[in-house]
């Protein structure tokens, strides 16, 4: 029984506690325990005020936390009631600086799915069903706190039945901000060549078109997809032709996860519901053109009610690729989709719930390795490593490709969704809108801006235009620091040896790096060695035409290169003009690029087209070719000369070794890993360092990663896992470097 006193307790709960049904959960728990007081949302999380002792309440709070919630901390302090409460209530949300976490969009929960499929339920076959445990979150928020008036759902006044659920603390839709039903909520429309249908008729029109082998644009949670029957080779070929996407792999949505490996099924059925890369053998019904020349395919399960309704009726795999023109950002509005995709889609399945934030599908490997972090994961906050405290607000702009930006403040960082290539005007507009919204949501005003060392980057130009103090960070230092931060390497953890492998990034003194061994801590980066610098004939064209890189390698390392059949792809080109340009240094900058080295080897083995249709195409084909070989004894090495890998020796041995192409592809990966491992071991041993870090886009190569781990098994190895190894994680690395320098007094608090 409560004491007759005005003394109580105030609990400050921080973590992922808004938009997850946390207040109704607290209310219900208080009712069960006969507690008196109140609960509310504010900018700092959830505040609970109790009249009674909170011990039992706290135990059950942790034990029965809602499925989408996460409690990071609970602080308690005495509270004096001006008037003792006689019940437990939910107070109106308040504002304040946003230190709480916003919840990512979540896949349809089992309860809503069952309700949607039950005849007689008022939301039977309703494609926008949701509750506190599932549905859109980040993609519908316009401002904080997370209440319906601050979301796109403000346009849909609740009907009496939904309003009753929304206000009933015992209902799972209590304070579920996206709650809706057929009477008061969003509805479907079908648009196709003058045809128009609504609601169930719209759904059936789309299903009929898909069964006929047509292409349908479908509005989802964070953007549009282009869909077609993934078994129908003609439909897939038509989609590729119309979208100008000849070879880039297409993601596929499966009706069920039957037959997939357990690890893949577990990832597919999480609330994040990402695309998961699995071996093609697990989905034999797909046509050959889904992921040509690769041994993996990206699969996903329905993640929203509309997708469930489609797949339940079709019972076949659907291509679900991003709804955009090639090289352009995916559409998020009906008007944009109808304009951009009219030459691709045969019909449009749209709805009238706006999308505030574009959110692409996240992509992970079966192992859990993150390749693209977006829907379902963003904007989950990331804890900064031990030692990072009271960091001032820092805006980190990332790289120009696979861009994300990062907000750093206090002891947390928030990484944006994948935004893409900043050279595109449409993506620049979406980037600015995403930043504006994130700053609004988190009440974030940066005190300084961090950008990449490349002065020509769009992001570097933006940093200079922001009229704030700026800090420059080397590209590969940021790669290494991002991996350190992911693994919670302490601020005072000391030095590590890092291997950063990618296409190119700006290094010291304007050098172009891409295959580097570094001594790194959060504040410092020392170059120790790596690949030798080789010309990039034609500049940016070298990233699109692998044969150019083979020519550059041959001119540098293979005197008699024209005698080898492996150079046929070069000899078919007008190579002599390029050779003179390289000799004179005309549009042929030097770069120690691991990505371009992969392209050269792929060209030599004939597994790369003359001109690539997507980034990484040659390297992915080379990895797939190598993966078909399960290891081989070979004579190929990359010894070290002055801390650089000796590529002249590699090419001489490799070109003169006669073996099947898959064995030669495997030997390249193995020799490269062995060469880098020996360099890292030598540099670490002489400094007494036992921890090695790996990052950069090339580290996504599973075979290279495995061979590096094999040769360095006696060290502590840190590989990226929950953040992308490539540029998608770069902005976090920029953030922790900037924060470490500020905490050390090297940067003035602007």
UniProtKB/Swiss-Prot annotation:
Protein name (record): Carbamoyltransferase HypF
Complex and partners: Monomer. Forms a complex with HypE.
Keyword terms: Ligase, Metal-binding, Zinc, Zinc-finger
Pathway annotation: Protein modification; [NiFe] hydrogenase maturation
Family recorded in the similarity comment: Belongs to the carbamoyltransferase HypF family.
InterPro entries: Acylphosphatase-like_dom, Acylphosphatase-like_dom_sf, Acylphosphatase_CS, Carbamoyltrans_HypF-like, Carbamoyltransferase_HypF, DHBP_synth_RibB-like_a/b_dom, HypF_C, HypF_C_2
Domain of life: Bacteria
SUPFAM superfamilies xref list: Acylphosphatase/BLUF domain-like, YrdC/RibB
Sequence positions that bind substrate: 19-23
Domain remark text: Contains a version of the YrdC-like domain which probably has a different function than that of some proteins where it has been implicated in RNA binding. Contains a unique C-terminal domain with an O-carbamoyltransferase motif.
Organism: Escherichia coli (strain K12)
Domain Acylphosphatase-like: 8-92
Pfam families assigned to the protein according to its UniProt record, in alphabetical order: Acylphosphatase (PF00708), HypF_C (PF17788), HypF_C_2 (PF22521), Sua5_yciO_yrdC (PF01300), zf-HYPF (PF07503)
EC main group: ligase
